[in-house]
Curated annotation (Swiss-Prot):
Assembly and oligomerization: Part of the 50S ribosomal subunit; part of the 5S rRNA/L5/L18/L25 subcomplex. Contacts the 5S and 23S rRNAs.
Species of provenance: Geobacillus sp. (strain WCH70)
Protein name: Large ribosomal subunit protein uL18
PANTHER family in alphabetical order: 39S RIBOSOMAL PROTEIN L18, MITOCHONDRIAL, LARGE RIBOSOMAL SUBUNIT PROTEIN UL18M
GO CC aspect terms: cytosolic large ribosomal subunit
Taxonomic path: Bacteria, Bacillati, Bacillota, Bacilli, Bacillales
Length: 120
């Protein structure tokens, strides 16, 4: 049986492999997702300048749901990050799932961001 520590180490190795290929530019920054057991975080990053342009998480003051570690919370974070990105003039991004499977909360966040107007 794989332990939680081993699973996270495998995820980090997978993310490092993927990060060699995915690179965010000023025209098309990277939408990065990080997931913990209780919260989910999304950042839009310009890798050319190494700057976070927009971020959203379940810890934000605008976040109004009580439960923070479920699919509904991920959808809300996806909408928030897309809304903030569109306010800054960002329409196209590169999706970086952070080494996680494209399923569940990660997929819900991505779908909500797409529906709110981001293209990837």
């Amino acid at each position: 049986m794989i332990t939680k520590v081993d699973r996270n180490a495998v995820r980090k190795k997978r993310h490092a492999r993927v990060r060699k290929k995915i690179f965010g530019t000023a025209e098309r920054p990277r939408l990065n997702v990080f997931r913990s057991n209780k919260h989910i975080y999304a950042q839009i990053i310009d890798d050319m300048k190494a700057v976070t342009i927009v971020s959203a998480s379940t810890l934000d003051k605008e976040f109004d749901l009580e439960s923070t570690g479920n699919i509904e919370a991920a959808k809300k974070v996806g909408e928030l990050v897309a809304k903030r990105a569109l306010e800054k003039g960002i329409k196209k991004v590169v999706f970086d799932r952070g080494g996680y499977l494209y399923h569940g909360r990660v997929k819900a966040l991505a779908d909500a961001a797409r529906e709110a107007g981001l293209e990837f």
